[in-house]
Each structure stands twice: as C-alpha cells, then as structure tokens.
C-alpha cells in the first residue's frame, strides 16, 4: 500500500472515533433528560392516576391454538400512579400495577412512561399519544426475578380518561402480546 492509502485509512478511522464521541455525548444528554423527567414527575406531579387492566391478546399468528385456548386474556388487577404534562404537552407518568398474566398468575410492573401527545381536533380534550415505558416486572414462570422492560406505548384519550396500550414483542409461542389498560387521571 502506498502512503496515501494509509493516510486515507487513518482519517477514516479518526472521523469514526470522533463520531462515536458525539454519540456518547448525546447519550449522556439523553440520560440526563430522562433522569430529570423522572425526578420532576416524582417531585411535582399534577395528577394521580388509577390504572385498570382491560385486555391481553396473544397474536394468533404467533401461537399454537392449543396454547392460546389455555391463556388468560382478561388481566384483572389495578394500579396507581402519578403524572404530569410538560410545557410541550407531552405526558410523563410513574406507575405501579399488578394484573393476572397469561397463566392467571399475578404480575407486578412498575416504571416510567412518556408519550408525545397530539390534540388533532378542535376539542382539546381529545388526545393521541405515542411513546415508551421503561420499568421492571416479575413473572411467576421466571420465579419472580425482576426483569427490565422497555416497551412502546400508544394511547387515545378524552379528558381524564385514557386507553393506553403496549405490544410485547417475541418469538413463536412466546411474547407477541398486546396489553391495554384504562388510565383515569385525578
């Protein structure tokens, strides 16, 4: 190889290293914002929330019929939380909920949720949300070992009542579950 190829390779690697540094700097900023949002939601809640699990649905294309016939898809339970709306109109919430899982065993979950919220109609009470939740759950079939979760969130609501939902991805006969609940703000 001639010298110009070495110089080109050096500059290519150098530019990649600089880019990695910027990515980590942005990750630090994101993590700081994440922590600050959790702290503010904990210390300065605007609302207290009641959570009522509504439905669990196992994607039929991803399960054997024998399994879905045995699964519980009525996850009765409940939970409480506190939430706030930020200056951009986005929702932030801290919550704890327990519900009956697919095997009809209790599953607790607690975490933080965030949704970018839009109000597409003239009636400001109607709102749509899209975001994520990060938290910890524990399941009977995993001996109640705490498991971290990072899942998508979506919602549709009117005033203080919101139908909120997530999808748990998975493989064949595992995961691929739609889970939804009602959230009432007080």
From Swiss-Prot:
This is Lipid A palmitoyltransferase PagP. Its EC number is 2.3.1.251. It comes from the Bacteria. It is found in: Cell outer membrane. It catalyses: lipid A (E. coli) + a 1-hexadecanoyl-2-acyl-sn-glycero-3-phosphocholine = hepta-acyl lipid A (E. coli) + a 2-acyl-sn-glycero-3-phosphocholine; lipid IIA + a 1-hexadecanoyl-2-acyl-sn-glycero-3-phosphocholine = lipid IIB + a 2-acyl-sn-glycero-3-phosphocholine; lipid IVA (E. coli) + a 1-hexadecanoyl-2-acyl-sn-glycero-3-phosphocholine = lipid IVB (E. coli) + a 2-acyl-sn-glycero-3-phosphocholine. Transfers a palmitate residue from the sn-1 position of a phospholipid to the N-linked hydroxymyristate on the proximal unit of lipid A or its precursors. The active site is at 58, 101, 102. The record marks 67 as: Role in lipopolysaccharide recognition. The keyword Ubl conjugation does not apply. The record marks 172 as: Role in the phospholipid gating. Residues 1-25 form the signal peptide. One of its GO terms (molecular function) is O-palmitoyltransferase activity. Transmembrane segments: none annotated. NCBIfam families: PRK11045.1. The keyword Membrane applies. GO terms for biological process: lipid A biosynthetic process. Belongs to the lipid A palmitoyltransferase family. It comes from Escherichia coli (strain UTI89 / UPEC). GO terms for cellular component: cell outer membrane. Keywords: Acyltransferase, Cell outer membrane, Membrane, Signal, Transferase. Homodimer.
């Amino acid at each position: 190889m001639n010298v110009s190829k070495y110089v080109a390779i050096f500059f290519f690697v150098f530019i990649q290293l600089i880019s990695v540094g910027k990515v980590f700097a942005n990750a630090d900023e994101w993590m700081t914002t994440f922590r600050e949002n959790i702290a503010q939601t904990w210390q300065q809640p605007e609302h207290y929330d009641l959570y009522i699990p509504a439905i669990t649905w196992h994607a039929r294309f991803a399960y054997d019929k024998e399994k879905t016939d045995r699964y519980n898809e009525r996850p009765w339970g409940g939970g409480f939380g506190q939430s706030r709306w930020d200056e951009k109109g986005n929702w932030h919430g801290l919550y704890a909920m327990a519900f009956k899982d697919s095997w009809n065993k209790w599953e607790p979950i607690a975490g933080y949720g965030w949704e970018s919220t839009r109000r597409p109609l003239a009636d400001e009470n109607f709102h749509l949300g899209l975001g994520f939740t990060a938290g910890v759950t524990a399941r009977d079939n995993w001996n109640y070992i705490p498991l971290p979760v990072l899942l998508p969130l979506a919602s549709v609501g009117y005033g203080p009542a919101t139908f909120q939902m997530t999808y748990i991805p998975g493989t064949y006969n595992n995961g691929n579950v739609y889970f939804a609940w009602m959230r009432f703000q007080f």
